[in-house]
Structure formats: C-alpha cells, structure tokens
C-alpha cells in the first residue's frame, strides 16, 4: 500500500515474492515471514523482515526510496510522519481486537512468543481521539479509538516502518 502511494506499481501478492519465508516452530518473525503470506492460516513477520523485503524490491527498481525501521517510537511520535505526508506501516491486531500470546517456540535458544491476531496496517491519519489506518486485509481505511490502537501497537512492540528518499 505504501509503495503504491509512492507511485510504485506492485501488488500485495507480487510483494510477497520479496519476503524471506520460514515455518512455524523454526522461524523468528524478526528474520522471516512465518508461513506463506498468501495463506490465511499463516502467522506473519515483524518490521525487520518488511524493511528487508521493501529494500530488495526498491533496489530492483533502482528507486531512490529506502525503507527505514523506526520501531520503538510512541504512537504520538509517528504523527509527524503523517503530517509530512509519509504513511507509516504499523503493527497492531486484526480489527484492533484484544490479543494474547497464543503459541511459543524456541529458535537458536531464544523463545519466540506469537501475539495473535497480529496484523500490519498503514497509519494514514489521526486526530485527538482517533487514528485512521489503511487496512490491506479489508482493502479500506478504518478508524479506531486512539487509546485502544496505541495499546495494540505497544503490545506488538511499537513496530513501525516508513519509506523515504
């Protein structure tokens, strides 16, 4: 969605070809997408995987844009990017539902806990009480109460990605 916003013509399914993929129980979501992104039963991935895939695509098109991981910022700190016309990819939950850790596994001696229903969206607007996100799963823009969305964003590790020159 963000790449299309910047005038780059790529579909969600074509973008999936740029993702590194791994399997449940053997993969760290910070390193690879867990499962097959075209399968609704797959898990997902976190910001470093998206940055790597986006940059791989951008380099293949000789684009001057670069994906940048800006994770760790409070939700309110992302609004300056929106003010500058830069949509921000953010992690939260499907339909802003409350979530929980549903499964865990060990990769290279480190425990990976999966928070579900994890979902990546694009933050496109805000006001004092609400945020608006472009949701690739639904294909539209949705509004959520800012405090609830901030809670979900925090629970997913305050992950955020921008694409800029």
Regions found by a protein language model. Name each.
Residues 96, 102-115, 124-165:
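Noncatalytic regulatory segments and standalone regulatory/sensor domains
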Residues 89-91:
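Structural motif
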Residues 76-77, 98-100:
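Short acidic/glycine-rich loop or secondary-structure boundary segments that cap or lie
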Residues 1-86, 165:
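Cysteine-nucleophile protease catalytic domains, especially the papain-like/related folds used
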